Structure formats: structure tokens, C-alpha cells
Amino acid sequence: MRRKVSIIGAGAVGATTAQYLAARNIADLVLVDIVENLPQGKALDLLEAGPVLGYDCQIVGSNSYDATAGSDVIVITSGSPRKPGMSRDDLLRVNMNIVRSVTEQAAPLSPDAVIIVVTNPLDAMCHVALEASGFPPARVVGQAGVLDAARFRAFVALELGVSPRDVHAMVLGGHGDTMVPLPRYTTVSGIPITQLIPADRIQAIVERTRDGGGEIVRLLGTSAFYAPAASVAEMVEAVLLDANRVLAASTYLTGQYGIHDLYVGVPIRLGAGGVKEIIEVELTDEERAALHRSANAVRELVQAMKQLT
């Protein structure tokens, strides 16, 4: 029996995620959106690309959550996109209500699913999905670190003129301005970038990574979608194939890194059933302090949500 992935939100990120997953041919796909005909049209367009691109998964679009029943993975992309001058935090009031509604409708129909949250502000929205679903924390995870690390890797590769496939990076913390890229754990074929790039250039790359989403917004007038969708597809594949991938993701911490009861980006082992292990890496005092500052920013958002409900 083929696996099933439901993507809630057929906008740019959701539809592109469906495109990338279809190309991998590892699951049947359902696109759901409140806009009439939008998910149906995009699903049909993707289905018709199958004979050319060589995939044969079923792809359907619907305005009803009933179509998602029995999903192995639910991807939540629904929400208001960032607009020029808008921080992720500005999205809080609008998107918390959207994510709560989506989760309350989708989760009961797929009680064994893994939920991957994409909606911003990401770490705060993971809390909403966790509470609304009633799922264990291991089965509610946020896509952030894969994207942030991908941006870091891309910028390092550009700096050195090497293939990004040879660059491996680690980014911790909340998905936003307070994220914590770790140059010490970033390597090119095993060589730390601290041995390859001057400190001032590393800092510039770190700052560009932190502003990665904002840079796209300023250029496009809306949020990125190719790289976020590719990052989601990688996480979905890890779950469906039980790949035990070591990836950074927004994960519910219960004391790891000295952080309690909070979603923050850290390295995890991701496979069937969601988060199999939270990996604690050794941090310097400065890195740990930066991670805690990032976590505090997330906690402030969570507290703000409580005031809004």
C-alpha cells in the first residue's frame, strides 16, 4: 500500500512541496486549500506532468479535509505570507488561528500521522499544532533548520567556489533573526570552515543566513518557496523511508540544552514516527548563550499567544 502525504495549503510552498515529492515518487499526495478549484487545478497539473517526468503517484486536490484521512504525514503550510517590512512575529495573531483550525480538522482523520509545520512564526506555530492535535511531541516537528542550514551551505559554497554538496552545516535556535549558525560544526568535506574562511567573512555569511528569509521577501515581495519546499520534502522522505536522517528541526525540548517545554531548532534523528532522538552537541559558553537568547525569543512568542487566546 502506497504511503500518503497531505499538504494543507496549496500556495507557493505547498504546491512546490507537492511537486518535489511527486518527483521522488514515494507517496500519494493530497493538496487541500480553502480556495475553491485551486488545489484541484494544481493537483491535476502535477498529475499531468507525471508521464513526462516519470512518476506515477496519485495526486488529488480538495477543499475538504476528508480527503486527507489516513495520511502518514501532514504538512501544514497554510497561513499568511510575509510581506515587505513584516517580521515573522507580526504574523503571530493571524497564523495561530489558521494553524489551530487546520490541525483540529486534519489530525483526528490521521491519528498516527507525523505533522510537519511550515507556517511562520515557525517555532510558535509548532506549539499551536502540538496543542491542537493532542499528538505526542515526537510526531509534531517544524521545518526550519534544514532550510536555515541549506542557506548557510549555499552561502559558504558561493564564498569558496565549491559544490554545496560538499558543505555540511548546523544551525540551531529559533527560525528567525535569533538563529544560531555554528561555524565550528560547518565543514567542507570534513574541513571546518574556520580553517578555510577568514573570521570576518564567516560573520558576514552568518548574518546573511539569519536574514535569508528577509532577503527573499525584499526581492520577491513575498516569502521564499523553492528552498522551503525542498527542505520539507527532505523531511517527509526521512519519515516515510525511516531514513534516520540527522537534521536540524524545530523540536519540543524537555531539558535538552537546558531548555524546557519549548520548540527550538536542534539536531534530531528523523525517521518513521517522527523524532527518534534529540542530539545534544557540545557548545561553547558563547554558543549556548546565543541559543538561550534565541529560545527566550520563542518563549516570548508563546507567552504572547496565550495573551491573544
Swiss-Prot record:
Give binding positions for substrate: 82, 88, 120, 151
Q: Please name one Pfam family that this protein belongs to.
A: Ldh_1_N
Which keywords fit this entry according to its UniProt record? NAD, Oxidoreductase, Tricarboxylic acid cycle
| EC number annotated for this UniProt entry | 1.1.1.37
Taxonomic lineage is:
Bacteria, Pseudomonadati, Thermomicrobiota, Thermomicrobia, Thermomicrobiales
The protein's matches in CDD domains, at most eight in alphabetical order, are given as: LDH-like_MDH
Positions contributing to NAD(+) binding: 9-14, 33, 95, 118-120
What job does this protein perform? Catalyzes the reversible oxidation of malate to oxaloacetate.
- InterPro entries given in the database record: L-lactate/malate_DH, Lactate/malate_DH_C, Lactate/malate_DH_N, Lactate_DH/Glyco_Ohase_4_C, Malate_DH_type3, NAD(P)-bd_dom_sf
Listed under GO biological process in this entry are: lactate metabolic process; tricarboxylic acid cycle
Question: Which reactions does this protein catalyse?
Answer: (S)-malate + NAD(+) = oxaloacetate + NADH + H(+)
User: Could you confirm whether the keyword Oxidoreductase appears in this record?
Assistant: yes
Active site, per annotation: 175
Can you name the source organism? Thermomicrobium roseum (strain ATCC 27502 / DSM 5159 / P-2)
Q: Which GO terms describe its molecular function?
A: L-lactate dehydrogenase activity; L-malate dehydrogenase (NAD+) activity
EC main group: oxidoreductase
Q: What is this protein called?
A: Malate dehydrogenase
